[in-house]
Amino acid sequence: MHFEHVAMNVPDPRAMARWYVEHLGMRIVRQVDAPPYMHFLADVTGRVVFELYANDLAAIPNYAEQHPLILHNAFAVEDMDGTIERLTAAGASVFSDETLPDGGRLAMLRDPWGIALQLTQRAVPLGA
C-alpha cells in the first residue's frame, strides 16, 4: 500500500489550481473540465499530490475560519523572506512567522481561499 493523494473540497478548484501552479510550483497531472472540476496537482518531486474539486454532495469547509493547526499544507522553502513576499503579493496573507530554538523557521500563511499553507525552513530537514 502507498499514499496516493489528499483531497480538498474547495469553492473554485480551477482558479485554485492555477494559483498553486503559478505560485507554489505545482503541476497539474490530471484534470476534469466538468463538475466537480477535479484537478490533481503534484509537487516538484511528483510524490505529493493534492486533489482539488468542488463537489456539491458535501459542504465546502470555511477554511479561513479554521485555525491553521487543524489543517495546513506544508512546503519546504529555501528563501523564507522572499517566498513570503512573493506569496503575499499574489494574494496570500501571513498568519504567523516564528524562528524555532534550533534556528529553523516556520511561517503560516493563508492562500487566497483561506487554506493554511505552512512554509518550513528546517534546521534539520525531515528525513535527514
Task: Go through each PLM region and give its residues.
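Core segments of cupin and vicinal oxygen chelate
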Residues: 8-50
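Exposed loop/turn and edge beta-strand positions of beta-sandwich/beta-sheet ligand-binding modules
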Residues: 35, 69, 103
